[in-house]
Design a protein with these regions (language model features):
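An N-terminally biased module of ancient metal coordination in phosphate/nucleic-acid-related enzymes
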Residues: 1-86, 96, 102, 162-178, ...
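C-terminal regulatory/interaction regions
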Residues: 249-252, 262-265
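Extended substrate/RNA-proximal surfaces in nucleic-acid metabolism proteins
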Residues: 50-190
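Active-site-adjacent C-terminal substructures of enzyme catalytic domains
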Residues: 175-238, 247, 254
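Short, basic, glycine/proline-bearing loop/turn elements
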Residues: 8-12, 76-80, 126-130, 196-201
């Protein structure tokens, strides 16, 4: 089965991708036979990490056009990954107004815990009695974003905290959060969003979301799934896609004749 386009890739234009390279990512996409690639750079306004900076959206658009001119046999899409866009509506809309974008991802990375803003990758560093509540807060914040009127088309890495689940805790089980996850999926389906299958960790246990949630997505009426490696360097483009396509197909979604199309029910 041919690989689908990778619709979630970061390059040197994202603050957390020092090894990213747009041109080399295009070369990698052609090398492995992808029909297309979407560069979805971080547009984040929570500043809790060292080296964080605002996306140079004008420079990004210029780089996209250079790559389109150079790699004519690859469909290159422009995009952004909006972090907590419902917290920052004005800068979000400014980024979206700066030029045409083919893909706009909505993501939750951070939540508010007491007086702190905490990235979900750092939940494991919080006191043990805070961690279960932090996961529930993550899903509450995701629902708030989906129910907001912020303009994005794809819900990215729905159960992002699973990537960083502490090995000394009980295994992550979707069923423990089923009510919250289904509420998010239902709201996303009503809004007509695409659900991303994020393969950044490769193995099925860390596919975000996994088979169980992808099946729930179909049950609540979700229409489409996209594939995103969340690559932050060229050699990771489409990483885990072989397995991800099998899982998405097992959940009841299938490709169309157009290799650039989303997978649908």
């Amino acid at each position: 089965m041919p690989l689908p386009p990778d619709l979630h890739v970061h390059t040197e234009w994202s603050w957390d991708a020092p090894s990213g390279d747009m041109e080399h990512s295009c070369e990698r996409a052609l090398e492995i036979g992808l029909p297309g690639i979407a560069f979805t750079e971080h547009a984040d306004w929570v500043t809790i990490h060292d080296g964080q900076h605002v996306l140079d959206i004008a420079g990004f658009h210029q780089a996209i056009e250079r790559c389109r001119a150079k790699f004519k046999n690859l469909q290159i899409l422009s995009g952004v990954e909006l972090g907590e866009p419902h917290w920052y509506p004005e800068p979000t809309r400014a980024v979206l107004a700066a030029g045409p974008l083919d893909r706009v991802l909505g993501s939750i990375h951070c939540v508010r815990i007491a007086d702190d803003v905490v990235d979900a990758s750092q939940f494991r560093l919080r006191p043990a009695d805070e961690q279960p509540g932090a996961i529930h807060e993550y899903f509450r914040e995701t629902l708030a974003m989906v129910e907001s009127d912020e303009p994005f088309d794809t819900l990215a890495h729905l159960d992002y905290p699973k990537r960083y689940w502490p090995e000394d805790m009980q295994p992550y089980r979707e069923g423990d959060y089923e009510e919250e996850i289904r509420a998010i999926l239902l709201a996303a389906a009503h809004r007509g969003l695409v659900l991303e299958a994020n393969s950044t960790r490769g193995e099925e246990g860390k596919l975000c979301p996994g088979l169980t949630v992808l099946r729930w997505w179909r049950e609540v009426g979700g229409e489409a799934v996209s594939f995103g490696s969340d690559a932050h360097r060229p050699d990771k483009v489409a990483g885990g896609f072989g397995l991800a396509t099998q899982v998405v197909q097992a959940a009841g979604f299938k490709p169309s004749a157009d290799p650039m199309s989303l997978w649908r029910r």
